[in-house]
Amino acid sequence: MALDIHAHRILILDFGSQYTQLIARRVREIGVYCELHPFDMDDEAIREFAPKGVILAGGPESVHEANSPRCPQAVFDLGVPVFGICYGMQTMAEQLGGKVAGSELREFGYARVDVVGKSRLLDGIEDHIDADGLFGLDVWMSHGDKVTKLPEDFHILASTPSCPIAGMADDARGYYGVQFHPEVTHTKQGGRILSRFILDICGCEALWTPSKIAEDAIAQVRAQVGTDNVLLGLSGGVDSSVVAALLHKAIGDQLTCVFVDNGLLRLHEGEQVMAMFAENMGVKVIRANAEEQFLNNLEGESDPEKKRKIIGRTFIDVFDAESCKLDNIKYLAQGTIYPDVIESAGAKSGKAHVIKSHHNVGGLPEEMNLKLVEPLRELFKDEVRRLGLELGLPYDMVYRHPFPGPGLGVRILGEVKKEYADLLRRADHIFIEELRKADWYHKVSQAFVVFQPVKSVGVVGDGRRYAWVVALRAVETIDFMTARWAHLPYELLETVSGRIINEIEGISRVTYDVSSKPPATIEWE
């Protein structure tokens, strides 16, 4: 009988915290499957999910205010361990008979908590011991309210000068709460604390590993698809590449990929995709050379949103035309990943309960009448990358920087022209090449060049040159929700600028974007 890698599972209830997805990623990293659901998940659904433990995440509300979110009673009726984090601790305390109040002194940022009580959760976990033999932890706080009275059978686990009950425990029931955030890297022992709860207290086994995920996904695809044929839009991005590798391993020649070359790809990207999948792996790939069609449709349009829509519609037209040439296609494969599913479910707000299919291909015509196969829909991006490596995809492909769906179309400001795209892809190639040489490519989260439809005077030899301006953009980020501009060495910027201006005749000036997000976005359009 095949191993069920979902058998040991953790339920995470979302109360609106910006860190909730991070909790789920940390649980997965420990090797245990988990799912994220809104705080008002139906009682019957909770029982059917049958978790080995429950984590109550944080949130921006105040427990003592009217109509603030509450944990379903079914969670406390399950008889499994429960771990409340920040707001999760507060609502647990209040619902089990304790009290919560606003605090005059709010705690945001780094803090030290003293471990003042023994418990299965924190015993043996510390960052330092003071002269009095008191254990301390360096943690990240983000709260205004605090627990002022413990529920019955709980004892104080940790405290700070402004928050005497910074942690609480009821070892008999396996109920724990902490006011700090163990899921963020700023809490140095956070990983150990979560591991202690999940592996030791909940008794979960680490079944969620890349090799087991690959085996499970292959088995699931074979069971779903049977002998039918599957169509995949292959973009060369991480998600579609991993789907292609996975499906090829699962069903071989039953898979056909359509690679739409829109003329807005990176330098040599089309050739690289064909070499990797068609030549090296033996995947059936149809390359649709549609550069002229895309550029004709984009002619004269400079509005960013309209450009995106034109590119999306043209992709659908090309993809549909190619798929009509194929016989007996029953399934459409998509690279939907777990954050897409969460977003579609509205988990952050808790307002939506139905998880809808996330059509990341972009609204394919309903008359195609194909059933969906989405083998990555349970995985976070970092898990997709690890799965890609497990399936034999090259590291450089799996860990490439994100590339927007509309491609260079949104990195060319204003109207898109072939001349601009050709100049931009060469400049971008130089930038990425030099980042790799200087060992900076994997130190930044995303790097690219933006073409500006502005001309500037330059000097080449004894003559003047009136040519285009480009901007370099490199950012560092954890979640792409916020980002800071990367402080690249001046010598590296000088090398990149010199190469672009000297090697590309149509460019006379290179600038560096020092805008962070917010207020700027990462992409310019």
From Swiss-Prot:
SUPFAM superfamilies: Adenine nucleotide alpha hydrolases-like, Class I glutamine amidotransferase-like, GMP synthetase C-terminal dimerisation domain. The active site is at C86, H181, E183. It comes from the Bacteria. The keyword ATP-binding applies. ATP binds at S235, G236, G237, V238, D239, S240, S241. Residues 208-400 form the GMPS ATP-PPase domain. It catalyses: XMP + L-glutamine + ATP + H2O = GMP + L-glutamate + AMP + diphosphate + 2 H(+). Pathway: Purine metabolism; GMP biosynthesis; GMP from XMP (L-Gln route): step 1/1. Residues 9-207 form the Glutamine amidotransferase type-1 domain. Keywords: ATP-binding, Glutamine amidotransferase, GMP biosynthesis, Ligase, Nucleotide-binding, Purine biosynthesis. InterPro entries: Class_I_gatase-like, GATASE, GMP_synth_C, GMP_synth_GATase, GMP_synthase, GMPS_ATP_PPase_dom, NAD/GMP_synthase, Rossmann-like_a/b/a_fold. Its EC number is 6.3.5.2. GO terms for molecular function: ATP binding; GMP synthase activity. Homodimer. Catalyzes the synthesis of GMP from XMP. This is GMP synthase [glutamine-hydrolyzing]. It comes from Pseudomonas savastanoi pv. phaseolicola (strain 1448A / Race 6). The gene is guaA.
